[in-house]
Amino acid sequence: HETPFTRENPFGLPPTEAVPFEPYVLPKANNNILFLTDIHFPYHDTTALTLALNYGKEKNVNTIYLNGDIMDCYKASFHEQDAKKRDMSHELEQCRNFLDILKREFPKAKIFFKEGNHEMRWERFLRVKAPIVLGMEEFELSTLLKLGEKGVTFIRNKQLVKAGKLNIIHGNEYKGGGGINVARTL
């Protein structure tokens, strides 16, 4: 059927399914933020993570922002894999345990979990290997990590986040190239 001509649509273009872009804005009260990114459980650096958490405790942060690639999602990757390496359930367990540690050590802090390109591997895996369960809440990464139960806010990849005047993105979201060398191109 034809689309009616209107002042807003003088050419009768078909209706759009695009969702208007709106950044996710962190509440102004969440202004003392510990940023953690690219932890890649289970390949994390315990020393570096311990230093970061100690710094967060010293500064009495009220917000923890996990800026993607908190998990590696090795088994959900389509890269060649070593069958002897850890499985996805182990990675999920390590990440859930880490979130429990954050809740224990920073009981008053609000936690935000931004999906990185490595977490996106899970959805891509489902899309290719198990499309019948794609979109089912029980198989969503946020559900598997129990983010809602833990009071953690999940933010999808490719969603700009603003903390005051600061724009926050994960490396793969930078349009200047791959995430590995983002700092070199800013």
Where do the language-model regions lie?
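Acidic, His/Gly-enriched loop-helix segments that form or flank divalent-metal centers
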Residues: 123-186
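Acidic, histidine-bearing metal-coordination/catalytic regions of metal-dependent phosphoesterases
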Residues: 1-35
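Structural motif
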Residues: 31-33, 63-65, 166
